[in-house]
A protein has these predicted regions:
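Catalytic domains that recognize anionic headgroups
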Residues: 2-494, 499-502, 506-520, 524-527, ...
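Extracellular/secretory pathway and lumenal proteins
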Residues: 14, 508, 582, 677-679, ...
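Helix-start (N-cap) detector for alpha-helical repeat units in TPR-like alpha-solenoids
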Residues: 444, 478-479, 512-513, 546-547, ...
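Structural signature of tandem alpha-helical TPR/SEL1-like repeats
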Residues: 458-465, 490-503, 523-537, 557-570, ...
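Structural marker of alpha-solenoid helical repeat scaffolds
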Residues: 473, 507, 541, 574, ...
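TPR/TPR-like alpha-solenoid helical repeat scaffolds
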Residues: 655-659, 680-689
Length: 689
């Protein structure tokens, strides 16, 4: 497939002049439809920052996202590869393969300082996009989910821009002559639509636009900083979205399920650095986001590095209406076992390959309401041939097992962001028989999303009622009992959860997350032997399931602490940032009087957000036993700040002060311990352990 490229005359012909190495800024604003931006013709929204950037650069009027999901789309943007090439087609696979280099790695290799601030868990470093960045501020790693509210799986544009400016200022102060590559990701337009004031009032009735306007406003702070720092003119700035938002069109509420233009037509603006010889303009032909990475390198003057990427840049060459743009969605396939969708777009037509094919004349029918496929078989055949030629180079290999899916933590975070992300096994027989068209499964999909929302709102009856209806329509959908089991477990309905997880495993015997969930609830039901068996079954299916290692460790900690420590250590080797895991491992080491190991893991748990007085007390004792008395004092004082009535912390702090020779401070803490607990009044400080 030839990538649509841009004629130099579209920018305006001018002789390029030699230019110092430019700073490079990539801005991605999540979930923005092109037709909801002022410079793309939107009338009911104010986007002055993006409109100003458009006046200084080139607006690509038909930029097409290759996949309408945040993480897979950003993998395309940063690597210049199609989803079927890099393997990132949904949320259910593995992190980005290290074979695929990102532009950050190239810029770093070329001597650039590299930084990124992302605004949602869907771009957490665990997915693999942090490679090449000196600084990658995600703040949504697994540990924060374990110790903080689920709402912290994303953050507002204001906070992200503030973090970005902090890094930019620090970088400029330390290395003012070193060029930088910086990526800023803003998440606000993604649902739920909840803009702050005054945008909430100003955009009442269309809060999605309010989110875009708010993101634009905050982005203005970055542009102001660039101008005040005299960096704007000489910087290369590319702004685009990862995908759009359906807003109810074609029955889809948000995005990811279908690939109509409401979710794949995105804004793309390129502001070249001063001296590039490129003038502002507009380009009407379709272009792909695969072109962003090589364009960044070419406009930065790294033409040799540009050749490393499979796609062409947006510059040079010849663009014709016959250079189609590709899109796909495997969301319905991977999570539900329904047919995947593939599409090609030309300047006039949008062809969607599905069990019921679709063809739209996007010039005459921009809303894609009139399917021309039954009437224009010749056009469909031409585009289908082009599509198959592309896909034959990378044949699709579906998984026959759903066992090695995402962790429970990742699943929960994605559900909090509105995604249903499971890995459904599809047999060769099912493929041969033909998979359901997602269009015919829209009701079930929306019902599952509504049920997930109901469970997160603690409305268990509503969620259960919706899923019961889904199960009636499709009794083989194993996701239904799994979701019921997860919801019942959150509501501490252990018996119900056990029944649901077992039903799930009858439908999908390879699903290790259901095994882990069943193990967890069986512990609460007092069936520890059976719980251990299911945890081990999960690990046979997926040895990288750190949650199963953790569950097994919790079970074995009652009878065999050495075995439990081994289980916990295995879990830590896979996921070292799970705060409760670090806490429990540290406490086991403490019980075995291995104070050095105890201090390491308890300190990590504290770093990850566990703000618990007993933990800091044990940490202080561990520091004391390893002769790190200043740290012991610091930890014990923190324990007392959390709980001033924790007598043990006062006692241990007194002992630490005594060892430091601070007798007055020691007597004060001993006195407080005695006041709080009479039994401590009889202790001889000289013999305190």
């Amino acid at each position: 497939l030839a990538l649509p490229v841009l004629l130099a005359r579209c920018f305006g012909a001018a002789a390029p002049v030699r230019q110092p190495v430019p700073n490079v800024i990539l801005i991605t604003i999540d979930t923005v439809r092109a037709d909801h931006i002022g410079c793309y013709g939107a009338k009911n929204i104010q986007t002055p920052t993006l409109d100003a950037l458009a006046r200084d650069g080139t607006v690509f009027e038909r930029a097409i996202s290759q996949v309408p999901l945040t993480w897979p789309s950003h993998a395309v943007i940063l690597t210049g590869t199609y989803p079927f090439q890099n393997g990132v087609q949904d949320f259910t696979g593995q992190p980005l393969d290290e074979r695929f280099r990102s532009v950050a790695q190239v810029f770093k290799q070329q001597g650039y300082a590299t930084g990124a601030v992302v605004s949602a868990f869907v771009l957490d470093r665990s997915w693999g996009l942090a490679r090449g960045f000196d600084f990658y501020d995600d703040a949504f790693a697994a540990e924060t989910f374990q110790t903080k509210d689920i709402g912290l799986v994303d953050r507002k544009a204001g906070e992200s821009v503030t973090r970005a400016l902090k890094w930019l200022n620090k970088n400029r102060a330390h290395t003012p002559r070193r060029p930088f590559f910086f990526w800023l990701h803003l998440y606000d337009p993604h649902s739920p639509y909840d803009p702050p004031e005054p945008f909430r009032t100003q955009y009442r009735g269309h809060l999605y636009d309010g989110e875009i306007a708010y993101a634009d406003h905050e982005l203005g702070r970055l542009m102001a900083w660039l101008k005040q720092s005299r960096l704007y003119e000489g910087s290369l700035i590319i702004m685009l979205s990862d995908h759009g938002e359906s807003l109810g069109e074609h029955g889809e509420i948000e995005h990811g399920f279908f690939i109509y233009n409401s979710t794949v037509h995105i804004p793309l603006i390129v502001k070249p650095p001063a001296g590039s010889g490129l003038r502002p303009g507009r380009v009407a032909k379709p272009v792909e986001t695969t072109a962003v990475a090589p364009t960044l390198l070419r406009l930065a003057g790294l033409k040799g590095e540009e050749k490393e990427f499979q796609s062409s840049s947006l510059l040079g060459g010849t663009a014709t209406s016959e250079d189609p743009a590709y899109s796909e969605s495997f969301y319905s396939f991977s999570s539900f076992g329904w047919s995947p969708l593939h599409a090609l777009q030309t300047s006039r037509y949008h062809y969607i390959e599905a069990p019921t094919p679709e063809l739209y004349d996007v010039v005459a029918d921009p809303g894609e309401k009139n399917n021309l496929a039954p009437l224009q078989a010749a056009t469909v055949a031409v585009l289908e041939d082009k599509l198959q030629a592309l896909l034959r180079k990378n044949p699709f290999q579906p998984a026959e097992s759903a066992g090695a899916g995402l962790s429970a933590d990742a699943l929960e975070k994605l559900r909090a962001l509105g995604y249903v992300a499971y890995h459904t096994p599809v047999s060769p027989e099912a493929l041969a028989a033909g998979l359901p068209d997602p269009k015919s499964k829209l009701w079930e999909f929306n019902a599952i999303l509504e049920a997930s929302d109901a469970f997160h709102a603690s409305n268990f009856p509503a969620g259960e009622a919706l899923l019961s209806q889904v199960a009636e329509k499709d009794p083989q959908m194993y996701i239904v009992p799994f979701m019921l089991g997860e919801a019942a477990a959150r509501a501490q309905k252990w018996a119900e959860a056990s029944v649901a997880f077992q039903k799930c495993l009858q439908l999908n015997p390879t699903f290790d997350q259901a095994m882990t969930g069943l193990s967890r609830v069986l512990v609460y039901l007092g069936k520890t032997d059976e719980a251990a068996l299911w945890a081990r079954n999960a690990l046979k299916q997926n040895p990288a399931n750190y949650r199963a290692w953790y569950e097994l460790g919790l079970i074995e900690s009652k009878t065999d602490k050495n075995a439990a420590i081994a289980d916990y250590q295995k879990a830590v080797s896979i996921q070292g940032n799970l705060a409760p895991l670090r806490r429990d491992l540290g406490l086991l080491f403490f019980q075995q009087q291995n104070y050095a190991e105890a201090a390491e893991h308890l300190a990590k748990a504290a770093e990850l957000g566990v703000n618990d007085a007993p933990l800091y007390n044990f940490l202080g004792i561990s520091y004391g036993h390893t002769n790190r008395l200043p740290k012991a004092v610091e930890s014990l004082k923190h324990a007392i700040r959390i709980d001033p009535k924790l007598a043990e912390a006062h006692l241990n702090l007194g002992y630490a002060y005594q060892r430091l020779g601070q007798e007055s401070a020691a007597r004060k803490e001993y006195g407080e311990a005695c006041r709080l607990q009479e039994r401590f009044c009889q202790l001889d400080p000289a013999t305190h352990p």
